[in-house]
């Protein structure tokens, strides 16, 4: 979620009215899945932070599938938001707002 690369909520929704919520347990599946989704016309990809491999999967997609716009889901803390940004996330989805998560988001928008 760098200043040049982050997206507003409106930009995300305008570009992709449907965003798959992806749970990945194996980083080897991340790039092939992302490529298949992009080939099918879906480029906004939300990788949830529900597995130990989620950040590595986000990083792999961000590096290997430049047509994809990878985001982080299940962002529950400022640490989650920061880690997702460092892994290449361009947007984040949180189950609830906290000021700490909001501050990280604003710092990267």
What label would you give each PLM region?
Residues 107-109:
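Conserved small/polar residues in nucleotide/adenosyl-binding loops
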